[in-house]
Swiss-Prot record:
Residues 84-102 have a biased composition (Basic and acidic residues). The gene is B1. Keywords: Signal. Residues 142-247 form the BEN domain. This is Putative BEN domain-containing protein B1. Residues 75-115 are annotated as: Disordered. One of its GO terms (molecular function) is DNA binding.
Length: 248
């Protein structure tokens, strides 16, 4: 049986090695709790053995042994249950850090209301700039997809790859309400209660296509790792989900 001092020394080493890591810090705390639980278990077991050997005890040895086993099993089950709960909490924490989109149960249905500017016959209602104006430029020639020239420059300066550029351009081309309400291409809102519609409208198809084309061409110019269109679209969907959970 290992000396509890060993676990304490191991804990100290882990704390020094992983002090800057949030996940490692959680792991260390879990290990510390395991040490505490195991130490308590050892103490309880020791006390049970001492009691069973007490000359003042009138309980038969067989019965005492059975009671010890039962109590030890109960203690072990309790520790295992506590550890399982901590592991689940740790996994939830890791999921939140790994996934860019907050997780919500599907059973929690969300309602959305189409904004006043919604136009069933013209998806350009989703655009921030529907026509040329001072300070705007076309993202690509002859596409009628406009963006603020300074914002475009900032997007290119801040982006480090195709995904980050696509996400930055997304919020400069489409309105906040569109990013909150719409899906990327328009899909049935199966998990939601909907007022006034059964399908989430999609972002303007021309603008979506121009955005993706621009990102791919600019990425090649910069020598970025080439990504397939689906990967970039998934990154855009994640950004839209962020808007939906934050503002929806």
């Amino acid at each position: 049986m290992l000396d509890p001092t060993f676990f304490i020394e191991l804990l100290t080493v882990l704390r020094n090695l992983h002090a800057v890591s949030a996940n490692s810090y959680t792991l260390v705390n879990n290990l510390r709790q395991i040490i505490i639980d195991n130490t308590a278990t050892l103490k309880d077991l020791k006390q049970l053995i001492v009691n069973s050997r007490s000359p003042n005890s009138d309980i038969p040895t067989t019965s005492q042994s059975t009671n010890i086993i039962v109590e030890v099993e109960e203690i072990s089950e309790k520790n295992n249950s506590n550890q399982k709960q901590r592991d689940e909490e740790c996994n939830d924490h890791s999921d939140n850090e790994t996934d860019e989109v907050p997780k919500k149960k599907r059973s929690q249905k969300r309602k959305f209301v189409l904004p006043p500017e919604y136009d069933e016959n013209d998806s350009r209602w989703t655009l921030k700039h529907r026509q040329m104006a001072p300070g705007l430029v076309e993202l690509m020639p002859h596409t009628n997809v406009y963006i603020n020239a300074i914002k475009l420059s900032n997007c290119k300066r801040l982006s480090k790859d195709c995904k980050s550029l696509a996400r930055l351009l997304l919020v400069e081309i489409f309105t906040k309400s569109a990013l909150t309400i719409c899906s990327l291409t328009g899909s049935r809102a199966r998990a939601y209660d909907v007022e006034g519609a059964t399908i989430r409208p999609g972002l303007d198809e021309t603008a979506r296509t121009v955005l993706l084309t621009y990102v791919e061409e600019y990425g090649r110019e910069k020598g970025w790792i080439t990504l397939d269109t689906q990967s970039i679209q998934n990154s855009i969907r994640n950004k839209m989900q962020e808007f939906r959970f934050k503002y929806g």
